[in-house]
Amino acid sequence: MGETGVYARVVGKKVGEGKTKIVALRADMDALGMEDLKNCEYSSQNPGFCHACGHDGHTATLLAAARILKSMENDFAGEVRFFFQQAEEIGQGARQFVAAGLLEGVDRIYGQHVTNTLNVGQVGVVAGPLNASCDFFRIEVKGKGAHVSMPHKGVDALYVASQIVVAVQSIVARSTDPMESAVVGIGKAWAGTQYNIVAEEAVLEGTVRTFLPEVREATNRRLTDIVEKTAEMLGAKASIVIKNYSNPLINDADATKEAKLVAQEIVGAENIITDYPKSMMAEDFADYLPHCKGTFVYFGTHSDKPGTDRPNHNGFFDIDEEGLLVACNMFVRYALYVLGTK
C-alpha cells in the first residue's frame, strides 16, 4: 500500500446472524530522520534514522494482534482489516489507505499510540477532540541584492522575513478567540549567500495547528494576509504555500465508549484516564474518521526503566515494553467487541 504500507485481513469463519461487521485496526510504521542516542541491543542500525516515536512498538503490537486474531478465526464472524500505515509523520499515509477504498464497508476503525505521560497499565480514552490539525506552510520572500555598505540600494529579504516572523505572532495573541486553541510556529529559516551581501531571497517554513475548522480557516487567511502585506510595506514581494498535512482528530462518541468498556476489562476502571489532555501535535489517523466511526487512544509506556521519561522525537526516547501487552490486548479485544465476540 503506497510506498511501504501493508494491508492484510482476517475473515472470521463463524457463521453470523444477519449482516456481519468489519473493523479496521491501524498501526503507523515510519521512523524519524534523527540519530538514535541510546546504547542498547535494539538501537537503530541506520545512521541518521531511528524510531523515537514508538511506531516500531505500534507495528509489533499489531503484528501480534493479527497473529492472535488469525488463530481465532473460527470463533468470530465478520472481518478484521489491518492497516500497517506508512508516512504518518508527514501526514500522507492514511490518505493513501482511504484512496485505495480500504475503508469501504468498515464499521469501526481503532488506533493507538504510546505515551510517556501515562504509566504502564494506564490508558487514555477521550471522546471528542484529541489532536490538532496540521498545516505546513512555506513562505518565500523576494528582495533586491546589494552590498551591505549600501543597504538603501537593495531590499533586504532577510529583514523582511524577520518582520514576518514577529508579525505572525499576533495571529494567536490578537486575532484568535482566547477560548479557542491555535498555534502558529516557524521552525525553519534561511536567507542570503554571503555575510556582506544584502539578502535577495529568504525562506520560512512553519506550521499552523488548530482544533476547529473555522479557526483553521481564519488563521491561514490571516497568515497569508500578514505575509503579503508585510512584504509589500517593506518593498519586497512574498508568496506563501499552505499544505493540509492532517485534519483535527475528533474521536467518535460511540467508538470511544466501546474502547472504554474494553479497556476496563483489561486494566480496570481506575486506570482509564478520561481527562487525558488534548494535544496540539497532529495525528493523521484523523483522516480516517470522516469515512467511518473510530477512536484513537493513548497507552502508557512510562516506568522506572531509564529513557521512558523522555519525550517523543528525542534521541534517548524509549518505552517499557510491558505497555505493549496492554496495547495488543486492546487491539484484539476491541476487534472482537465490535464483531460481537467478547
Give names to the regions the model predicted:
Residues 20-24, 79:
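Residues that mark the start of a beta-strand
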Residues 24-26, 35, 137, 296-302:
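Non-cysteine beta-strand/loop elements that form the S-adenosyl-L-methionine
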